[in-house]
UniProtKB/Swiss-Prot annotation:
Positions of the AGC-kinase C-terminal domain: 293-367
Any coiled-coil regions, as ranges: none
Compositionally biased spans, kind Polar residues: 15-28
Organism lineage: Eukaryota, Metazoa, Chordata, Craniata, Vertebrata
GO molecular function ontology, one term from the record: protein serine/threonine kinase activity
Protein name: Serine/threonine-protein kinase Sgk2
Length: 367
């Protein structure tokens, strides 16, 4: 499994009293008791992801439950804001997970997300070791489409890895986890925060140089390499040596790859971000590469292409593609409990003003 993200920045409060306004409170009345929490399906630094069933209509969702105390202790309010803001923008893209609700109690934050149960790309790679080129091309194209969309919104993703790439029940990609995204980065602008996951860090990040959206194309190259060869391109169990490899070791591509695949990997994994594929025309550079010549991008976007792998899930309750380490864990009763008031206006809750959100009724009905 890839290492945990490193170098998460410590954001500054946006107001003198430390309160963060996370947007309009369109759904102030939602509460945990609206859902039956069935299984733990994932875990993170500040909480868990659970499979939940909405009592009113039986709809299934993935609910990310975060502990406010942990977030406040680590001064991560701004990251929660950034993740929520990015999630709101993702609703209309086919390969990005959508946010349906967000609400809070005095102790916890709740993200109610689209539920997909085809498993993490990481899960399937661990089981199969590597993919053939057509399958790797399909996943890479869908991920590139999602990354290109984020870039069009001036968002750098910064944490692309197999664990953050899910498959839906049909086998299409769903990109998730936007906690390290950087918003408001214009095409010619840079940022400099040291963050990401060690195996996938670009050289410019390791050198602590200003970097731009080309950092995401490096990560895409690293994920493609791993899909084709079973490990990230410069992997070493010694993290310091791995960093040295990323910075200085020439890219080594094992035999058996097509010329197009080798050329794409060399372009994406160019150590000079100014020469990297994607540094000039961003997603268009990727889209027009010969490796993707079999792809009709309009058909891809509209999910008219048949995925190369079908997860064969038997309905929402089928959890065979989730790690048993998670699914066998007991669901805490406190997650589904709620006080008489959904969230107080003082203490921890005041640091997350306006967190609550709900889609328009039309959006929910269309989904």
């Amino acid at each position: 499994m890839a290492s945990s993200p490193v170098g998460v920045p410590s954001p500054q409060p946006s107001r003198a009293n430390g309160n963060i306004n996370l947007g309009p409170s369109a759904n102030p009345n939602a509460r945990p008791t609206d859902f039956d929490f069935l299984k733990v399906i994932g875990k993170g630094n500040y909480g868990k992801v659970l499979l939940a069933k909405r009592k009113s209509d039986g709809a299934f969702y993935a609910v990310k439950v975060l502990q406010k105390k942990s977030i406040l202790k680590n001064k991560e309010q701004n990251h929660i804001m950034a993740e929520r803001n990015v999630l709101l923008k993702n609703v209309r893209h086919p390969f990005l997970v959508g946010l349906r609700y967000s609400f809070q109690t005095p102790e916890k934050l709740y993200f109610v997300l689209d539920y997909v149960n085809g498993g993490e790309l990481f899960f399937h790679l661990q089981r199969e070791r590597r993919f053939l080129e057509p399958r790797a091309r399909f996943y890479t194209a869908e991920v590139a489409s999602a990354i290109g969309y984020l870039h069009s919104l001036n968002i750098i993703y910064r944490d692309l890895k197999p664990e953050n790439i899910l498959l839906d029940c049909q086998g299409h990609v769903v990109l998730t986890d936007f906690g390290l995204c950087k918003e408001c980065v214009e095409p010619e602008e840079t940022t400099s925060t040291f963050c990401g996951t060690p195996e996938y860090l670009a050289p410019e990040v390791l050198r602590k140089e200003p970097y731009d959206r080309a950092v995401d194309w490096w990560c895409l190259g690293a994920v493609l390499y791993e899909m084709l060869h079973g490990l990230p391109p410069f992997f070493n169990t010694d993290v310091a040596q791995m960093y040295e490899n990323i910075l200085h070791q020439p890219l080594q591509i094992p035999g058996g790859r097509t010329v197009a695949a080798c050329d794409l990997l060399q372009g994406l994994l160019h150590k000079d971000q100014r020469q990297r594929l994607g540094s000039k025309e961003d997603f268009l550079d990727i889209k027009n590469h010969m490796f993707f010549s079999p792809i009709n991008w309009d058909d891809l976007y509209h999910k008219r292409l048949t995925p190369p792998f079908n997860p064969n899930v038997e309905g929402p309750a089928d959890l065979k593609h989730f790690d048993p380490e998670f699914t066998q864990e007991a669901v805490s009763k406190s997650i589904g409990c709620t006080p008489d008031t959904v969230a107080s206006s003082s203490g921890a809750s005041s640091a997350f003003l306006g967190f609550s959100y709900a889609q328009d009724d039309d959006d929910i009905l269309d989904s």
